Amino acid sequence: MRELSVKCRQNGLVFSVDNYVKDGIKNAAKSVSSDKLIAAVPFYTRLWLETPKTDAELASEEGTEAANYKNKVSSTALGMDEAQQVVQDAGAQTEWDDTTKQNYAQWETEDGTYKIWLEDTKSLEEKLKLIKSDNLAGVAEWKLGWENSDVWDMILQYVN
């Protein structure tokens, strides 16, 4: 799964529209007709924390792929409303990233640098537009209960 890859741990995304949704649909459609294909969308976001590696950690990783990254990265999964609250509590401002089609925020604390690409109704709508334009059979969501109250009316606008 993408979120477990080293690249994702550096980039912080769960499922961006630009490549993972478009490419996922395109690749799946090579094996399954669109009228039988269901695309999944996330109702969660990951809050990423980057902390600088110590000199000892960098030395121990020398010669490995991990040595290419100067920060340790950890993450926590958050539901849509909880993620919005974390951003608000941090006093951070979100801005729309047109490449990933997600709202993004970043802030610093004594713990390190926090980064979050929000899954919200706006980012979800971008994914649903692709699902509808590719005439897919439907949409699946993960994880039920982590969505905010606005998503279901929007989903009904895009899914048969």
Role assignments for model-derived ranges:
Residues 19-22, 43-48, 123, 145-148:
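Solvent-exposed loop/turn segments at secondary-structure junctions
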Residues 1-5, 25, 121-128, 136, ...:
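Extracytoplasmic/secreted envelope proteins and their assembly/folding machinery
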Residues 11-13, 33-37, 136-137:
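Short, well-ordered coil/turn segments that N-cap beta-strands
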Residues 99, 130-133, 144-160:
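Aromatic-rich peripheral "rim/lid" segments of glycoside hydrolase catalytic domains that contact
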Residues 39, 131, 139:
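Conserved, mostly hydrophobic/aromatic
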Residues 1-23, 30, 158:
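Chitinase-like catalytic core of GlcNAc-active glycosidases
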Residues 41-130, 159:
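Glycan-binding loop/region signatures in secreted carbohydrate-active enzymes
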